[in-house]
């Protein structure tokens, strides 16, 4: 399955829970929840990394697969937020492409 099809599948799954007829208060409630879920997943990434500056981590290996798994969760919840706001997978992929071009230009100009 292509990545675009997989992203579409995520959006379709989210739509089982995210209704188009939600009130503004309901959208805000779910946007807040999905934001908290995303923050929780980001925190789980931090927990996979050595963080105690006083401890010697020279022999510690990071579980990159566990981190990749948490990043997948971050993206899934992020796509949920996109859906809650009324956008779809094409909207976010276009936004990512546009923002990436802005970021590249900024880096090239010494931003």
Locations of the language-model features?
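Flexible "arm" and connector segments at domain edges
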Residues: 1-111
